[in-house]
Amino acid sequence: MESSFIFGCVAEKMTSAIPDDKNWYLKGSFDKANRTSVEAPRGPGIYDSIDIFEDIKEKFTNIKITTDIHEPWQAEKLRHIVDMIQVPAFLCRQTDLIRECAHNFDVINVKKGQWMDPGSMRHVVEKIRYYNEDAKVYITERGTQFGYDRVIVDYRAVDIMKEFCDGVILDCTHSTQQLGQGTTGGNRNLAKAYVKTAREFGYDGIFAETHPAPDTAISDKDSQIDLEWMASVINTI
């Protein structure tokens, strides 16, 4: 989440583009805790972000908010304002983090670790339901490690993971990432193709980073999708 202004721009544009009967979440990260460079901006922090989330919900009453957490104590702080909590891919096996997510939230989205096979995600879902048997659990595919510096999407994973979770989401932007020297690259055109074709491969939904001016984005600028384009196609997929 670069700023409250940009977050508000995305909220306004997507709210006007998506019908009220569609199930969607506005996502903003309060802390980009795994930036490639120690000098890279990380975000506004949890407490300022809670204020931003509250302002957005007051202005757009039909919006549901999601964010990701990195430490167990953060779950309790967010439970009153966040509708779905996200477990980052790098942390998807951390039992203490998963426990606190399950104790504080009934809707949980787990990003599949880039190194994990689809079937192994069953154990992550079982952990969540051990602590909250009524939790609705989604798994987000964000690519599988392919060599040292890139990820690819294995479409065979969809049906495997659907057997033990409530829905499988395709992360259209992070799934194009290419690791670099101090920055993370990506492929915006490929991300757009994923947006358009995810349904054909059986995904239940999409996750995508969008920005009013992607080339100026502080994070993941090579894979972020232009906000105008996203708003124009969201109801055609």
Please provide the spans of the model-predicted regions.
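Conserved beta-strand positions in the central sheet of alpha/beta enzyme cores
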Residues: Y25-K27, T66, Q86, N109, ...
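Active-site-adjacent loop and "lid" segments of alpha/beta metabolic enzymes
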Residues: V38-Y47, Q86-L91, Y148-I152, S175-R199, ...
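Catalytic beta/alpha-barrel core
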Residues: P44-G45, F60-Q74, D83-L97, D106-P118, ...
